[in-house]
Structures are given as C-alpha cells and as structure tokens.
C-alpha cells in the first residue's frame, strides 16, 4: 500500500511539472484543447470543492455573437495570462482577458470560397500553442485549410514564417497553404475541385516538440452518395519556420503497409479517413496519436472492398518523421458511422504489478480500447469474432470484427427484445409491434436496402452512430488515481439504403461525378429509430450515464444517470401506471461536458424541468456531492484553470463563454 501511495505522490508531482500544466506567473494553465497533451481534461487546481461549490457565481460572460459564434465547440486555452479561442464561421482567433472577459485582440483570415464551402466552418474546437525562442505562438487551422501562426501577445501573423499563399488579402508571412502539400491539383482561392473531393478542418493542430502535426476533416459521409474523394492525409510542419516536414498517407499507396486492404483500385479515387477528432501526443517519446474517420461513404462500401486501412483506427506516428510506430483498426471496412470521435487519452497504468504507458480510446461502439502507447500491444485481449454478413447487393463486409474483452462495455451494444420498453404488458406489446418492420441485432447489425427480401424497413444499430461516446462530450481522466470518466448515451440508428442515384437527389449541392450503388436513404445523419407510441424511446432507460473505470484493473467504479428524468418522460410513465421505483432516473439522454479536479467530477446537464444545472460528483462513488443552477446549457467541453490566485470553471454556452468563480475572484472586488 505504501508503494502505491508513493507512486501517486510522484505522479502528482510529474503532472504538475508537465509541459501542458506547468504553472506560469500565478496561473495554473489549460494548455491544449484537453488541457495537457494526454487530453485528460484534469486540473490540479483545488480552490473549488464540494464545500464551496454552491458559492460559485458568474465572474463574466464573453459573447461571441459579433464574431458569428453559434455552436460553442471551442475549449479555450489559458496560457501565460491570456485565454485563446476560436469563434464563428470565419473561425476568428480571439485572445481574452481571463480576469474580465474582455477581448484583447482578434484575427480573421480573409474570406475564400474554399473556406465558405466548409461544412465544418463553425466547428472550430480550439487552438494550438508553441514557443519559438521563448516567444508564444498561437496556431490555428482554418476552414479553408490554411495553417496560421500568430504572435500570442498581439495576434499579428509571424514574420519569416511560412510562405505567401497567392491570395489577395493574406499576409506575406505567417501562413501556410496546406493544400499544396496534399498532392492534389488545386486553386489557391477556390481550393480542390469539388468533384475530386474536399478537405477542411475542425480540430486544432498539436505541437509535439518542434513539430506541428495537423489533422483534417472531410464532408460528412452521411450527406453523400458519391464515391470519389481525397484522403485525409496527416501533415506536419516545422514549428520554427512553417516549412513542410512530412505527410502520412491514411490510404496506403502501392508498396506501403496496408495497401492490399483496398481492393478494386479504390485507393486511387476514394478517400476521407480524415482525423477530425483532436490529436494527442507523448512528447517525451516523440509520438503523436491520430484517431481516424471512416472511408467514403457511410453505410455502404461496396465500391471499396477490403478492410480499408487506416479507416476507423488509431495510428501512432513518430512526430519528427511521420513514420508509423503502430496502429490498430477498431472496425474493418467501416460502414456503421463508427468513426473515432474523441482524442485518445494517455495514462500511466499499473496493471497486475506492471507499469504500462497506456493510451485509452473511447468510441461510439461502447468499448474502451486500451493499448501500450509505445508498442500498440493491447493491455487486455481484443479478439476477432464473427459478425453478420450483408444482404445489400455489392456489399462485402469483413467476416470478423475486433471485440474488446475487458473493460466491460459502457453502452448498450445491439438491440433485442430484452432491451425494449416493457414495464407493463401494454408497453411491451406496443414495443414489439413497433419493431416488426425493423431488423434487430447486435453491435455490427448491417444496414439493409429498400425492397429487401425480408420486407423490412431498416436495420437497427445500437448504440448508434451518434451514440456511445461522441465529440460533444469528451472523456476525462484523473491521472493521479488512474480513473477514466466518460459520458455515454444510447442513440440507436435505423439504417436504410436506397439506390445511389435516388439518394444523390436528397443531398443539396451534390458534387460527385460517380454515385455509389447504394447510399443513405434519408437526408440527415440517417433514418431515425422508431419511437414508442407513448413518445418514449423504444429501448429501456437509462438513456444517458456517466461511467467511471479504474484503469489499473479495468473494473467499473460506478455508473450514474446524467441529469434528471425529463418531466415529459415522468408524465408518460405516470399515465402508463409505471412507478418511479421501476424506471428510476432515466437520465436526460444527453451527452454532458465534464472536468475533473483533485476533489470532484464536475458536469453540466438539466433538471427535470429543463433548468440548466451543474453537479459535482464524488469521484469514487458517483454520488452527488454538490449542485447549483447553471446560467445556461453547455456542451462540447468544460475547463478549469487558475488566474490571479483564483480557480475558474469555464462553460461553453453556445455563442458565449461563461466563467464561474467564487465571489473573491470577481473583477470588481479588487481581490488578488
């Protein structure tokens, strides 16, 4: 026991001294999107506790409406006494005074058609930061796929960095046009021809030692019937100069590892496999971890037979050279919209007496995949198991898929009669009648097509392409106690395909030249699942939970519903004669933003009447330790940092940023 305690103390010291959390002039920083390179979203700040949680007040609000902010996806970074964030469809870069919430400076890239086309324009999630000879530098990737380096104090583009991009209005220095390094024909103003494909960005780059590593985004696969696209290759640049360093091909070319997983010569003309989720890094070992999207398109891959590396994978690359250290593919020949949605989380574990430098990936599938982050060896066995074949003409799925044997799943995987709403005989009968037109099955239940031999409407997929863990609620981790916390929900999809030429008519501004044999059968993400006639979800609650794992053992510590049962659900259950003791707290059904501190796990959701709330949970049991009404709903992340001696909690509230602190931190109080 003494050895374990000593290890925790030593680890606490190392966390305090790590580059992502190092103190600077009375400021406990929030260095990256996830606070540290490990993306733990953990703060060492401890002024706030369950005892004073109820005393939190709004210290200030920053309103991004003038910058066109809408979604609130960006988690600000607090570095050297300033907050840095992005906002709006033009992805303004903004520096904010953390004491007052006043804008210090802002920068906006000149408008271009290639940026205005972006379907991820208002999806900016934050900035990256580095130092050049002691000078702070803010780095941003724009919707138009330009990399810009700004002086952290002034917001002015760096001199003698990057190269002229050949577009009117852009600075002569401080910018890199990254399209030139992808290797496709393009126009600096218009971008890559849309019939070829499209590349944009939502997550920030990451600085690993002296290398800037850049991911990217593509057009959503559920909004397309086309088969042509460009690959989302990973790019890297020199931090000091902006010079190009390397490119990693996410769709392997002839002679490269994994090329044989692309049959039908699909590697030549299809694409995606982007890395739209944030990246993580291990600077000490010069490794960067890339979570990838699926290949073009969602729900049908008959034109791209094979396992399709490196789709739906995690890739560990040497940050200096771009060489692959290892990879693991979570889903072979991915068609379920099971892309990898959140940053990998790095933790140093002690498993059965063995110290393991680990990386943990939460997924939509309801599994935590855990690896030795240096070698890629699974910490616990992952087995290939048989899965159903497709009945859709032209589709050939992998006969097996990886199955995590430990830790236990955190979400409902698949749906059967036992999962349906059945609290009364009438509710059960209605559930069964509703599901008669749908094919139920396991996690890898494949889509079906219209006019299928079974006469069914769609195939159920649970927890669904929007279920499990997703980008709206990044996981958090306590690296001192090695506990991993995640927010999950069930959001089953009903997968229905129609002929590609018909599907193409459903999508506005279609740009492809060749359509797939089959494609998504409805506009939007996919066919929504059927609802119970009562208005409830067709499956039993809880609908959303926070799950905690002890990652040294893989055991679940607790599972608790998020928020409170919505009043509309209570009313339905009351009419059906179902007491609350039977259905319990259903959870709101929402994914929730979280941050973890030395004394509590903080999250935001809603009370039964829709009131926005903040809850502080006991980190060991999940029990509510404190709660308070929040000023607004928040999502996509939460952060906590110290400025001028006081701890703040930052909420991302749509177009605004809301800073909470104790009364002593209020700007007008004069407290220091």
Label for each model-derived stretch:
Residues 25-65, 547:
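Mature N-terminal segment immediately following signal peptide/propeptide cleavage
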Residues 280, 401, 405-491, 501-502, ...:
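Long, low-complexity segments enriched in small/aliphatic residues
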